[in-house]
């Protein structure tokens, strides 16, 4: 089947030019008992990269495995079954299943997770049967992790979950999984499957993110960048397709309410963060 190419001119040429790996990609160990040191490492990573991995984050590895299993089982269902929880056509509703391209190589499903009043189970798959149980258990752990990182900044925030699914693509040089962007929300928690394709833009080049399973990748969004008056970096990133294998990622977006006006903290943008000079 011929690939419907994105409008890239020239192509990405990923197979011909080795994109350098981010060998110094920041990793933060949340099991460290020195809370001040952990906070400084998070601040430093947010300033310099706008993205980092956390290990020993409290989300059980077995739960991550079960989450990827039920997500894969859903996306491998016939299209007619997935359409039962599809996002309504021409609707402003964000929740539900949606195919991103006519050839079915890119698709996703959105769920609101928090607050509970925003959750609409009509858009939650009933097949596989364990989908809701596993997703809700993961949501509890994801909320705890987000609050640990954000502290009081996460109070009153909404939690939106998205599962991205990218089928193998014969010409990955020509088709982008997700085009380069920054996240509009405050904070993103991302857990990929074993086929990883996330890249970040730093120092005028794209870098592969060296993923450490089962770490959680933390991405600083536009709202945190604005609240910190630019000290924290809203990183530009993108996702690639794979020629032979299916890629999938489970993503939780933490966002302020839609009617909230977001602004930087007055007087001193450093008031909410610890200095990193002693690292």
Curated annotation (Swiss-Prot):
Keyword Heme: no
Cofactor(s) recorded in Swiss-Prot or TrEMBL: Fe(2+)
Chain positions covered by the region annotation Disordered: 1-25
Binding-site list for Fe cation: 181, 183, 237
Record pathway: Secondary metabolite biosynthesis; flavonoid biosynthesis
Binding of 2-oxoglutarate, residues: 164-166, 247-249
Annotated keywords: Iron, Metal-binding, Oxidoreductase
EC number: 1.14.20.6
PANTHER family hit by this protein: OXOGLUTARATE/IRON-DEPENDENT DIOXYGENASE
Protein name from the UniProt record: Probable flavonol synthase 4
Species: Arabidopsis thaliana
């Amino acid at each position: 089947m011929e690939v419907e190419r994105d409008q890239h001119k020239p192509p990405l040429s990923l197979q011909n030019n080795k994109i350098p790996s981010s060998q110094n990609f920041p990793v933060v160990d949340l099991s460290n008992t020195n809370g001040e040191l952990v906070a400084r490492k998070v601040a430093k990573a947010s300033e310099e990269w706008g993205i980092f991995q956390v290990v020993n984050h409290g989300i059980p590895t077995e739960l991550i495995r079960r989450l990827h299993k039920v997500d894969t089982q859903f996306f491998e269902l016939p299209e007619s079954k997935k359409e039962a929880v599809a996002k309504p056509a021409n609707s402003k509703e964000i929740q539900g299943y949606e195919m991103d391209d006519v050839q079915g190589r890119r698709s996703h499903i959105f769920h609101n997770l928090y607050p509970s009043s925003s959750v609409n189970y009509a858009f939650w798959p009933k097949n596989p049967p364990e989908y809701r149980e596993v997703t809700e258990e993961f949501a509890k752990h994801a909320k705890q992790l987000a609050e640990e990182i954000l502290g009081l900044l996460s109070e009153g925030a909404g939690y939106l979950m998205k599962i991205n699914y990218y089928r193998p693509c014969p010409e990955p040089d020509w088709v982008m999984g997700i085009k380069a962007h920054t996240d509009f929300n405050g904070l993103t928690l991302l857990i990929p499957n074993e086929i990883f394709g996330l890249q970040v833009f730093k120092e005028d080049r794209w870098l592969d993110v060296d993923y450490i399973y089962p770490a959680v990748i933390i991405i600083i969004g536009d709202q945190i960048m604005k609240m910190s008056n630019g000290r924290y970096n809203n990183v530009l990133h993108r996702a690639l397709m794979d020629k032979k294998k299916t890629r999938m990622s489970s993503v939780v977006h933490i966002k302020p309410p839609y009617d909230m006006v977001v602004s930087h903290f007055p007087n001193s943008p450093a008031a909410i963060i610890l200095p990193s000079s002693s690292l």
